[in-house]
């Protein structure tokens, strides 16, 4: 894979300005392994200047470039930055890239026909490559228009070009990523399902575009209407659950989705104090668990040990069915991944099983969040829940990396490098999960690993095509670079491919005088490009050259006696000297070329995860080749130590910056939470009274000259309480986001640590301890512990559940304004008193039993200032209703003239209780009076104000 660009203009100028053959060759070599911007190939004048700058009659590599310039310029041509815009409108990016490549091809066609002609013949000739590029463009345009299949591209040398790989990557992302798999989904009979299950699957299949087979589902809006009107027991007020609202965001979200469907408005949103969806016995008994990942709110409740009113037997049975379904899903995924039907078919089948279970990329992200927020921590009341947790973790991780690989997949070397790195990250994260869930077989829900089951994503190198292309390269030197480039792009093993292919036909050797060979070797200077072919062909010359030049130069390089840039110059000379006189130095030259580019990658900070371990392997190969001539040869570790620090110190710095940023943020959060917790506790435990006439709360403020009264309107106080509690929630969200970033960084640390550990037994020794990655890992673990401890502390503060302390203020009123208006406008002769009963909202749930009351304290003036700093609404002032509001004009008695209203007291399931029950009853009576006064105090031109609680 190419890591950086070179300007064709700059290369051309350098070739024109230098005089030595070695310098010109060096520029060509540099261009050989770097990217060229496609926009430069659209500049006909620039391309012609480059071709005219190539030296004449130099033979070998430059001669091949001169006669095969279309191949040479296009093979490393890149379409970026257009290609890098792949996050924007996708079809537009594909069109831009195709247009750019088409312009470059047209420009080169013009050059070949008008100026340079199409010299030569064969697979890599200018004429054939231009023809193949035209065919490739036609194929890509047809795929983009959906008029041909992705897999219909015929084998062509063009598919190995960087520009073609970039277009293929875009096309595969566009066509594979959002496509519904063409597999049988085996949908159940929806008619036997309950309304909730039908609505869930109807919304899912219509949103994702999943076929439902022969069975038809009712419209999601109709089903939502049925849920809202006939299944009120599905919904529960957030103040009626035993955990704070933040621990049930998905139950809240599910209720919101139902109401959006009900209103047929995807933008609608229920209020903060709106209902949640709860678990029901009948649902858990009948839900089809093969759609497990559609029920995030159920997993959320079970993770928090919350079963609502469901029996333990029902929950246990539901969990057991979920375990069976997810185990089957794991088996199906393994079958989909191992079937030898080609990567596209593997992807189709694998994605089909994920979608059938409801495991879309979005749902995968939601379940990862749920696992992060999981509160059970292994302490659960349901025996099989830990097993379910492990299954969900493994399958969610698998789906996460499946979608990550799907975004990267194409049959290209670009995809191979990215997917290999992604699967290394998957292995690291899976290992972290295994360690977190304990040792032993139990911690592994499946026999397969994520890197193993997703290995079908790794594109295989087109070795047959590469071999044919290699056979069409006449220059041995160019052929060597071709295979080295293939090795770097496709991560080929040098011992299996390069060792066989980098063996050009040797020139016939000639007998030589040994003294002449030694004398000639002594006369050779670093930088010489000319050589005496008759001596270079001698059998003994290579051995003598290694002793007198190669080994001493390599000793100086590895001992760091030379500046690194000077060392690279000498290494480059070793590679290029007499390169077109095989078999001279062929055994040493192969690993030297690989070593050169690997060192260049490291010192240029073009970081690739495998760079350092590859560099060690190439160093070993170089040393082995040198030891054939100098058996006692050894290399100093100085260069390796330097490259180790260069390669990994930047990574360590990034890891340190991440953890330091986390510590700084967490420290700031802890300081702010301390103030927030104190203010929340102050309000929670303060004494106050309720002024029913003014609709205000009155707090006695302790002062030097006795108590003062701080009066605040109920809406302002509710806003204060809600804001303080929301601040707590925001802190938890901030901590979770920081923890997510820290976790991602920790996975990077795991991958790097694993790579370094794998090098400890390498035959090339160096100082592993110069960078303390183990200490860094310990620091990360301490940070995770700190985050968990702080989040737990925040969740246990009064401020975190402050609205529960003042729950009655946030509840809907027991009697609505419409009912009050009906009472005021009641006609003895026309109206039936029984109509009032339908307007009375009976409490729907059970308030948790009163907790033990703590000590109450009076607020101080400083407390008021502290509260106001965090919640500006905490300001003194009475309600907007006038104090002398118009009183009721009707006369009421305790009896009715005709029909009495008989309230069934047993239907009142809930009663909000305070410490003083008499005060509570007195307050409720006064509240009703206030509602009447407010109604009568408004004129018809000014509609009566409504408490938000009445409209929710």
From Swiss-Prot:
Key word Transit peptide present: no
Subunit comment: Interacts (via C-terminus) with the large tegument protein/LTP (via N-terminus).
Purpose of the protein: Plays an essential role in cytoplasmic secondary envelopment during viral egress. Interacts with the capsid via the large tegument protein/LTP and participates in its transport to the host trans-Golgi network (TGN) where secondary envelopment occurs. Modulates tegumentation and capsid accumulation at the viral assembly complex.
The keyword Transcription is annotated on this UniProt entry: no
GO cellular component: host cell Golgi apparatus; host cell nucleus; viral tegument
Organism, scientific name: Alcelaphine herpesvirus 1 (strain C500) (AlHV-1)
Pfam families referenced in this protein's UniProt entry, alphabetically: Herpes_U30
Official protein name in the record: Inner tegument protein
Localization per record: Virion tegument; Host cytoplasm; Host nucleus; Host Golgi apparatus, Host trans-Golgi network
Keywords assigned: Host cytoplasm, Host Golgi apparatus, Host nucleus, Virion, Virion tegument
């Amino acid at each position: 894979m190419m890591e950086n660009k070179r300007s064709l203009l700059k290369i051309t100028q350098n070739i024109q300005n230098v005089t030595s053959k070695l310098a010109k060759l060096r520029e060509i070599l540099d261009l050989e392994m770097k990217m060229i911007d496609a926009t430069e190939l659209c500049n006909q004048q620039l391309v012609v200047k480059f071709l005219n700058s190539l030296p004449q009659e130099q033979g070998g590599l430059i001669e091949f470039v001169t006669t095969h310039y279309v191949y040479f310029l296009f093979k490393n041509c890149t379409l970026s930055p257009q290609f890098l815009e792949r996050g924007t409108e996708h079809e537009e990016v594909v069109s831009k890239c195709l247009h750019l490549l088409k312009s470059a091809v047209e420009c080169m066609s013009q050059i070949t026909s008008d100026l340079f002609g199409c010299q030569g013949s064969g697979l890599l000739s200018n004429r054939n490559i231009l023809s193949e590029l035209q065919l490739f463009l036609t194929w890509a345009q047809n795929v983009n228009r959906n008029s041909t299949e992705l897999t219909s591209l015929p084998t062509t040398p063009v598919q190995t070009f960087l520009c073609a790989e970039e277009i293929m990557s875009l096309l595969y992302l566009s066509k594979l990523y959002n496509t519904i798999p063409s597999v049988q989904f085996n949908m159940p009979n929806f008619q036997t399902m309950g309304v909730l299950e039908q609505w869930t699957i109807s919304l899912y299949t219509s949103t994702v575009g999943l076929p439902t087979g022969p069975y038809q589902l009712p419209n999601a809006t109709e089903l939502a209407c049925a849920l809202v009107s006939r299944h009120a027991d599905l919904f529960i007020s957030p103040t009626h659950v035993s955990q704070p609202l933040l621990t049930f965001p998905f139950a809240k979200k599910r209720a919101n989705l139902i109401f959006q469907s009900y209103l047929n408005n995807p933008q609608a949103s229920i209020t903060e104090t709106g209902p949640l969806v709860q678990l029901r016995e009948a649902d858990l008994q009948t839900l089809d668990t093969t759609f497990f990942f559609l029920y995030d709110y159920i997993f959320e409740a079970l993770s928090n040990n919350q079963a609502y009113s469901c029996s333990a037997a029902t929950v246990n049975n539901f969990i057991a069915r979920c375990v069976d379904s997810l185990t089957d899903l794991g088996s199906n995924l393994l079958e989909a991944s191992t079937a030898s039907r080609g990567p596209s078919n593997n992807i189709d089948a694998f994605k089909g099983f994920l979608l059938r279970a409801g495991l879309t990329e979005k749902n995968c992200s939601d379940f990862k969040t749920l696992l992060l927020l999981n509160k059970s921590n292994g302490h659960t009341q349901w025996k099989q829940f830990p097993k379910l947790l492990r299954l969900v973790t493994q399958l969610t991780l698998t789906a996460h990396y499946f979608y990550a690989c799907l975004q990267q997949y194409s049959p290209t070397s670009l995809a191979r490098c990215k997917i290999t790195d992604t699967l290394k990250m998957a292995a690291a994260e899976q290992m972290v999960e295994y360690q977190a869930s304990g040792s032993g077989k139990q911690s592994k829900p499946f026999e397969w690993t994520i890197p193993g089951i997703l290995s079908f994503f790794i594109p295989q190198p087109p070795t047959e095509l590469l071999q044919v292309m290699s056979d069409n390269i006449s220059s041995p030197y160019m052929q060597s670079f071709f295979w080295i480039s293939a090795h770097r792009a496709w991560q080929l093993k040098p011992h299996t491919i390069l060792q066989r292919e980098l063996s050009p036909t040797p020139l016939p050797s000639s007998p030589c005088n040994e003294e002449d060979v030694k004398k000639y070797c002594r006369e050779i200077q670093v930088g010489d490009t000319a050589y005496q072919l008759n001596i270079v062909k001698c059998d003994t010359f290579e051995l003598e050259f290694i002793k007198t030049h190669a080994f001493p130069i390599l000793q100086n390089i590895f001992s760091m006696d030379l500046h690194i840039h000077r060392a690279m110059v000498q290494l480059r000379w070793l590679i290029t000297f007499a390169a077109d006189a095989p078999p001279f130095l062929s055994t040493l030259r192969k690993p030297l070329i690989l070593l050169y580019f690997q060192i260049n990658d490291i010192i240029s900070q073009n970081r690739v995860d495998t760079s350092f371990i590859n560099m060690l392997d190439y160093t070993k190969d170089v040393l082995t080749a040198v030891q054939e001539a100098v058996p006692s040869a050894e290399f100093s570790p100085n260069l390796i130590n330097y490259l180790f620090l260069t390669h990994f110190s930047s990574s360590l710095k990034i890891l340190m910056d991440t953890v330091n940023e986390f510590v700084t943020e967490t420290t700031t959060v802890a300081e702010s939470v301390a103030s927030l917790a104190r203010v929340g506790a102050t309000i929670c435990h303060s004494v106050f009274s309720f002024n029913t006439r003014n609709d205000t709360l009155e707090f006695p403020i302790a002062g030097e000259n006795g108590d003062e009264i701080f009066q605040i309107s109920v809406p302002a106080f509710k806003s204060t309480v809600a804001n303080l509690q929301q601040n707590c929630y925001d802190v938890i969200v901030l901590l979770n986001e920081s923890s997510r970033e820290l976790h991602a960084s920790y996975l990077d640390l795991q991958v790097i640590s694993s790579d370094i550990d794998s090098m400890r037994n390498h035959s090339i020794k160096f100082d592993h301890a110069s960078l303390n990655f183990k200490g860094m890992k310990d620091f990360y673990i301490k940070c995770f512990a700190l985050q968990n401890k702080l989040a737990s502390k925040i969740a246990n503060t009064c401020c975190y559940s402050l609205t529960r302390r003042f729950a009655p203020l946030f509840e809907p009123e027991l009697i609505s304004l419409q009912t009050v208006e009906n009472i005021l406008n009641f006609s003895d002769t026309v109206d039936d008193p029984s109509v009032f009963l339908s307007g009375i909202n009976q409490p729907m749930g059970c308030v948790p039993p009163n907790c033990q009351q703590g000590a109450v304290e009076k607020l101080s003036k400083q407390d008021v200032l502290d509260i106001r700093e965090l919640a500006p609404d905490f300001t003194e002032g009475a309600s907007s209703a006038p104090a002398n509001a118009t009183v009721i004009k009707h006369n009421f008695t305790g009896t009715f003239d005709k029909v009495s209203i008989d309230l069934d007291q047993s239907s009142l399931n809930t009663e909000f209780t305070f410490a003083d029950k008499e005060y509570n009853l007195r307050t409720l009576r006064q509240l009703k009076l206030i509602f009447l006064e407010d109604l009568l105090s408004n004129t018809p031109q000014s509609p009566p104000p409504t408490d938000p609680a009445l409209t929710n």
